[in-house]
Amino acid sequence: MKAGFLNGKLSTKQVILDAKNIFHNARWFNGIVVCPYCGEVHKIYQAKDGSYSYKCGKCNTKFNDKTKTLLHGSKLSIESWMQGIYEVFTDNFITSTQLAIKLHINQKYAWLMLAKLRFGLLQDDYLLSGIIAQDEMYIGGSLSNFHYERKLRLLRENHYILPNERKYDKSAIFALNSKLKQPVFGLNDGNKIVLYATPNPIKSSYIKKVVKKHITEGISVADESKLYNDWKQETGLELSTNNHHNNQYQSKDGYTSNPIENTFSWYKRGFIGVTHCKYHQLYLNEFVFRYNTRDMNHSDRFREALKHTIGKTITYKDIKQQKSIFKTTKRNELSLEEIKSMLETGIVSEVIQNHQKYTKESFK
């Protein structure tokens, strides 16, 4: 294989014509084939036809370059995969329908390819340090833009109004808005970012767990949220606070959380299309990878993306069965009489404060 494919610039034509060699060199370090099942190095026999198919002399297992990678078990050719990876990471955000047209494949195959690639871009290896800005954002449409009948249905399902009631208070809309959206917690140290879709409602314990995983040392910069109470005791990091309610956007030490807020703004503007909250972490993985490799050219980013396909396997069943972190915790039962009395005494506000106690069974 020519050195240009390893270090130089690549074009779509080059990627397609030499796809097998490109993936082979990315798959095996220094060209040394290792059995993915038992780790044998010496007794590896290649197929006589010269293809990239092998047999291990130790465990008698047959394998190829796609074994134990994101391409494992895929019916698509290596050429289609290499072109797909190149198209995804050398262009702006691309949808499965656009990718299907470029690769001349079914949209379902293109969707699965995108899902696998995004799954492979895990954020576990990113370590941040220095001055780290952190904040939360909420992704999703505003309830005020929903059709009137849909608003009523959602308000009834979440027990902000009684069954068959057709009037609602604006405070109920405001409270339900945050509940229907997907929370995202982010970190930005000025060089790299980390974004995680969190359970709704967002919890302080989850945030501190993410911070301990990704921040080695430094100073955290955040707003006045209660999520950051007992910060230094539980994370070991200094916390600099900006009180946004008092129009304070820079702390006394001169630190600001604007970098992560800018990141959220880029994400909301850049990710346009049909998305589902169940797979939102996959979209965040792609955005984080693009941001953290923004200084690379297209060819280097393509090679970096190839590294994330190695040693990871996932099937369509795994993707569809993954649990949605968007789901809220189950609420305790409350009788219809109790809800009526609460509405009579506290109108809507008290119901909003206690909405986590209600379940749909209360109205049956």
Name each model feature, range by range.
Residues 1-364:
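Residue-level recognition of single "structural anchor" positions
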